[in-house]
């Protein structure tokens, strides 16, 4: 250890109480940043995975402009060709086909406009959580033809129960009248009010017959094995689709294009969180600034003596910066270790938010949240603390360079 480092280490502990308080403030800020960033990233991942498992999937293959217009004529014409491509991509965990249309649905008492989704029961169970959301009755099977699943809120609005029949009336792909009668086999509840109020699911084969789809579908829904692989999968699928030479090229959309509202909510929450973190770091920076300004005032005479016997201002500045960075690094390392341990505990056991379950359900989140510790969440916050505290310590350290030895030694 150099002489300057030894001097800095001894100077740090001249006022033990002040040093410990400063280190604790830095450690607490680092701990809080590690945990809160991990909690934010974990909640975002939960929101994304919950939403894609209920509605969109991580990726979808669609006809161009179908996402904007929802025109029943804009179809994926030969889905089995797409299936052959998807089976060759190892990062794809599962996929399924869906048909989408709007219709009027009537019970004996009421009529509502709903979104009708045709699903492949076997594949859908691997792609979405719909099967686990059934609260009454059973999920669809491959043998079902005229059965349907409806949301709990829709069932309440229509005043129907299991076994009741519903009349579905819409327009087919060829412009013909699409009409059928289905029997309620299951009632689901996702916790997302808009979805539970206006969704009905029927077997894909029935959907294709009723809506004159001629074997076509509207969506090929893909689930990736990890959120990290979505961009790579999207690129692979787009490259493979370009080789099909379709007259009307298909589009590959990822989750943030399919759910722009969710993406915007995450971005807004992240920005508000960053503002809070910045304020926290600034508080710590002012604490460091205050500590070193007080140290300079208390040690002005000492600095004057050192400069009088030949110590250069640059060396004094170096010693002061070593002092500040040593305290900062002790606090940051302590904060990262403790914050990571706390985060890992809650990453396994979760945090109970059952008291706010009704609010969280609007975002498709259950009453228990799990932080997600990563290198980004563990390092980015403390790194910001390090940079800003260095800048805060730079001012008092440079202030020493302007001291005049004679005047400094007269200070009492």
Language-model segments: residues:
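Alpha-helical transmembrane segments
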Residues: 31-59, 343-346, 350
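N-terminal Sec/SRP start-transfer signal
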Residues: 1-34, 43-44, 49, 314, ...
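Short helix-loop junctions at transmembrane helix boundaries
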Residues: 334-380
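A structural signal for hydrophobic secondary-structure junctions
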Residues: 64, 74-215
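Mechanotransmission and gating elements of multispan inner-membrane complexes involved in transport
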Residues: 172-273
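C-terminal membrane-exit region of the final transmembrane helix in multipass inner-membrane proteins
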Residues: 373-412
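A hydrophobic alpha-helix feature that marks transmembrane segments and, especially
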Residues: 33-42, 266, 270-308, 316-321, ...
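Transmembrane alpha-helical interface segments in multi-pass membrane proteins
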Residues: 293, 300, 304-347, 380
